[in-house]
Every structure is written in C-alpha cells, then in structure tokens.
Amino acid sequence: MASNKVVFSALLLIIVSVLAATATMADHHKDQVVYSLGERCQPGMGYPMYSLPRCRAVVKRQCVGHGAPGGAVDEQLRQDCCRQLAAVDDSWCRCSALNHMVGGIYRELGATDVGHPMAEVFPGCRRGDLERAAASLPAFCNVDIPNGTGGVCYWLGYPRTPRTGH
C-alpha cells in the first residue's frame, strides 16, 4: 500500500512539474507568434499575390541556361531578385513564395502544374530545370530558409508532386 502512495505521489509530482513548465513556456513566448506554414505562408499574407517578379525572370533565364548558377543572368537582375526574396519577411515563407511563383510561371505559359521533369515548359527549358532553378534561389541569393537543405527548398525533393499554387 505504501508503494502505491509513493508511485501516485511521484506521478502527481511529474504532472504538476509538466504543467508548471508548460505555463512558464507559454508565458515566456506570449509575445511571439507561433504558427504553422499553412496559416501564414499564403499569397497575400506571407508574400505578395504576384510573387517575386524579378525572380521569375532569373529562373526563366537560368532554365534556358540549364540551371547554371549565375548563367545568363545579369547582375542587376540577380540583385533585384535577391532583394525581393529577402523582402519576404518570414524566412519560413520563402520556399512557399517560390513554389507559388513556379505555379504562376506554369499558368503564364499555359502549362499544367504537374508533369514529367523532362517535359519542356518553353523552348530550351525543361520542367525539372525550372523547378531546380527556383528551389535553389535561396542559396543563389544567400538568404536564410529554415525548411530546406543547403539553401535549396524542401519541395525540390518531390518533383512529381502536384503544385498547389501556394
């Protein structure tokens, strides 16, 4: 009977400790906004509806140059693109903005959002090259993205998944 009281007391102490720690953390983070990507990283909220127009031009030029970093892109255009990407205030939203931009490029060209990576979306530019150029822009621009590896957006690893347009 005494051992049950000890176990019960220990469990009660653990529960009270967890609740106290949770309350302390909630109080500590009360001024910070914590959200999932889906709540904030939407066109018109986390980034503009027509996102990154200068980056669209960079991606198209890189694609025709078959993704060579800096290939066929003049310095002013690169700087403009990098400023636009860095201006997406929430670094968590940068890959979402680039994904939305790629969907916009496809719509502008009359291409579907999904297709084979080797399919051309415009002369000299294959779908896979376009997506690779877009996903690599954070590394190209040296801007922080917490949701990718080596400055490359996470969605590049899923080239055959449907694009949501945001």
UniProtKB/Swiss-Prot annotation:
- Annotated S-S bridges: 41-93, 55-81, 63-125, 82-141, 95-153
Q: Which UniProt keywords apply?
A: Allergen, Disulfide bond, Glycoprotein, Secreted, Signal
Q: How is the protein altered post-translationally, as described in the entry? A: Five disulfide bonds are present.
One GO cellular component term, please give it.
extracellular region
Known glycosylation sites: 147
Q: Cite a single GO MF annotation.
A: serine-type endopeptidase inhibitor activity
Task: Indicate the secretion signal residues.
Answer: 1-26
Q: Which InterPro entries match?
A: Allergen/amylase_inhib_rice (IPR002411), Allergen/soft/tryp_amyl_inhib (IPR006106), Allergen/tryp_amyl_inhib_CS (IPR006105), Bifun_inhib/LTP/seed_sf (IPR036312), Bifunc_inhib/LTP/seed_store (IPR016140)
- Please describe what this protein does: Seed storage protein.
Q: What is this protein called?
A: Seed allergenic protein RAG2
Which gene is transcribed and translated to give this protein?
Answer: RAG2
